[in-house]
């Protein structure tokens, strides 16, 4: 969702069961040389590691001249150390580790012409996980009531949505499409193309400190992707998304990434030409294969979302509604099967299934089917909420399909309750619900924009109803509500809502 480019459209803590890591030990796994070394940067020293349950925290001393640090983890299947994340500080936490030994390396990086170059990597860091249990999980067993029949059927999906709490969208940022930038553009050029500043760790920390528990990062991967029919996503683009994902996970929040509008190629799914439809699926598979493989070892607090609002009307073409629903269901099933096939943590990673148009009524239609899944209790459904559209989307009184500059009557509140109650179809079946976007357009008057009357009531009711039903609501924001310059709310009443 783009509301005229202004409304911009995380349990591992546990018993101390680990062993002190061993450094500079005799290697008993292949130790592949990490490429692209920047000789001027020395290897990080003073490395320390601690283990708690199924997570490890690794710290090191600052390296002179470093712009950040790259964390590598050994991948037994690839027999190589692969990049896990890039962080700006001198500490990182990796959660969700399985029982056994895990190997890491740290390298300082500097940024040259927008591209990170890694210095000499550290000696291998060995971390031993004796148990993958967590106190949080045990505590929940002791203090919560027995799950309902529906929650047993689908496992932990409902509890995942509840744990995600209040969410926030990094809107008009990594999903910005800007063909005018040309072939030499950097990821940060796209990041700023729709008017937002470069995302910093301070910004994401401010999101956390403002009361949010999860962050959705819409992404337009096609911005930097090959045009040779192989649909190879640029390593540079991955690196930038890695950084932002790292900011979110380092702040112990859930993180969602997707394929967003992405320039509109989704409409090819609805073409009358079978070859065009087949090419669209080839593209979709190629993109999700790369994304899933790239993030296969990331914490399960990183959630993949199958699509955005385009899955539905934009993929329909001249098909009947029945055929369109079948196509949407097929795309979502392909997404689940493909991600699970890539292994690693993707075997059990929570996956967010985009509803039809992400519209509540259309997604609640019986023709929309949730995919089958080899993992138990890991599927959630995604819908968006911009109703009434004349209030939430329209920003001026001359809007051709109507305009409202206020909200908050009993009729308005009752209509919202009725909409949310439709989603019981999913929670009753044990599926967690994520309202991936909701928001209200500002009122435009000349060149100025002001918040509409009742925006506070709209947000308050979305948050309170979501808490009542166990949904995760995610505010769409492009600095309208949480300024990325000041890292503060733009309206005083927001502090009381979030």
Locate predicted features:
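Sec-dependent signal peptide cleavage junction
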Residues: 19-40
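Pro/Thr/Ser/Gly-rich low-complexity, intrinsically disordered linker/stalk tracts
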Residues: 38-65, 114-132
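Short beta-strand segments within Ig-like beta-sandwich modules, predominantly Fibronectin type-III
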Residues: 83-89
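Beta-strand-rich modules
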Residues: 94-116
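N-terminal carbohydrate-binding accessory modules
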Residues: 138-214
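An active-site-proximal structural segment forming one wall of the substrate-binding cleft
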Residues: 194-214, 230-261, 268-306, 328-340
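Active-site region of glycoside hydrolase catalytic domains
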Residues: 278, 282-412, 418-441, 468-469
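Substrate-binding cleft of secreted/luminal carbohydrate-active enzymes
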Residues: 410-495
């Amino acid at each position: 969702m783009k509301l005229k480019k202004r409304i911009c459209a995380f349990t591992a803590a546990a018993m101390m069961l680990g062993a002190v890591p061993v450094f500079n030990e005799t290697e008993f796994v292949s130790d592949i040389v990490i490429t692209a070394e920047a000789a001027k940067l020395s290897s990080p020293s003073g490395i320390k590691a601690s283990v708690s349950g199924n997570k490890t925290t690794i710290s090191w001393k600052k390296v002179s001249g470093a712009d950040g640090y790259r964390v590598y983890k050994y991948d037994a299947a690839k027999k190589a150390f692969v990049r896990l994340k890039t962080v700006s500080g001198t500490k990182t936490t990796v959660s969700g580790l399985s029982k056994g030994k895990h190997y890491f390396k740290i390298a300082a990086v500097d940024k040259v012409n927008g591209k990170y170059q890694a210095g000499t990597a550290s000696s291998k860091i060995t971390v031993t996980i004796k148990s993958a249990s967590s106190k949080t999980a045990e505590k929940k067993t002791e203090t919560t009531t027995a799950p309902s029949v529906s929650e047993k059927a689908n496992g932990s999906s409902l509890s995942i949505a509840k744990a995600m709490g209040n969410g926030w969208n990094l809107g008009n940022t990594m999903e910005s499409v800007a063909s005018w930038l040309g072939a030499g553009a950097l990821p940060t050029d796209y990041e700023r193309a729709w008017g937002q500043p470069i995302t910093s760790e301070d910004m994401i920390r401010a999101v956390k400190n403002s009361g949010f528990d999860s962050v959705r990062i819409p992404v337009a991967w096609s911005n930097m992707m090959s045009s040779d029919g192989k649909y190879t996503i640029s390593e540079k683009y991955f690196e930038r998304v890695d950084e932002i994902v790292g900011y979110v996970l380092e702040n112990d929040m859930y993180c969602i990434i997707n394929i967003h509008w992405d320039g509109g190629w989704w409409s090819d799914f609805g073409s009358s030409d079978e070859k065009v439809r087949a090419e669209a699926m080839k593209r979709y598979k190629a993109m999700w294969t790369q994304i899933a493989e790239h993030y296969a070892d990331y914490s399960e607090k990183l959630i993949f979302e199958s699509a955005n609002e385009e899955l539905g009307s934009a993929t329909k073409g001249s098909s009947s509604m029945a055929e369109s629903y079948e196509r949407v269901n097929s795309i979502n099933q392909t997404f689940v099967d493909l991600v699970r096939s890539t292994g690693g943590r993707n075997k059990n990673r929570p996956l967010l299934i985009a509803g039809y148009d992400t519209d509540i009524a259309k997604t609640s239609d019986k023709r929309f089917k949730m995919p089958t899944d080899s993992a138990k209790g890991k599927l959630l459904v995604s819908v968006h909420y911009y109703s009434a559209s004349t209030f939430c989307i329209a920003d001026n009184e001359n809007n051709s399909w109507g305009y409202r500059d206020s909200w908050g009557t009993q009729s308005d509140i009752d209509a919202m309750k009725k909409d949310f109650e439709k989603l019981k179809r999913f929670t009753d079946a044990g599926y967690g619900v994520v309202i991936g976007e909701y928001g209200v357009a500002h009122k435009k008057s000349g060149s100025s924009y002001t918040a509409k009357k009742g925006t506070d009531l709209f947000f308050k009711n979305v948050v309170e109803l979501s808490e009542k039903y166990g949904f995760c609501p995610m505010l769409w924001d492009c600095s309208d509500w949480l300024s990325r310059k000041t890292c503060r709310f733009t309206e005083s009443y927001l502090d009381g809502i979030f």
